Amino acid sequence: MSTTPRQLALLAAETCDEKKAKDIVVLDVRKITTISDYFIVCSTSNERQARAIADDLRVRMKEIGKREMGVEGIEDARWVLQDFGDIVLHIFHESQREFYDIEGLWADAKQVRWKKPSKKS
């Protein structure tokens, strides 16, 4: 069974959430670029957390047959970029995210709901 790019993006967002990343956003960039189908953007409070997210996603993708095509910034872990072809994950330290403003640069991208709304009691 093949995994769609959207399913990969949702898996990445869920991985970020499980590792306690903040402000997770999934952007559908298919109509505005050919470099990838989806960008996933999240914030972390420290470098260890950023590396843990990247490591966990690499393992999960490998389990479903997706190979990491490239990774940048893992040493410093202030902005980690993980490229899986169909999706690109941007893991930002909180202090870097506002400065680089990926969501602003890709403002024409459609945001994808990735999390089920909480049930109200």
Please identify what each model-predicted range represents.
Residues 36-38:
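Short amphipathic alpha-helical segments
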Residues 41-43:
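Short hydrophobic/aromatic beta-strand micro-patches
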Residues 82-84:
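Active-site beta-strand termini and strand-to-loop segments that position acidic
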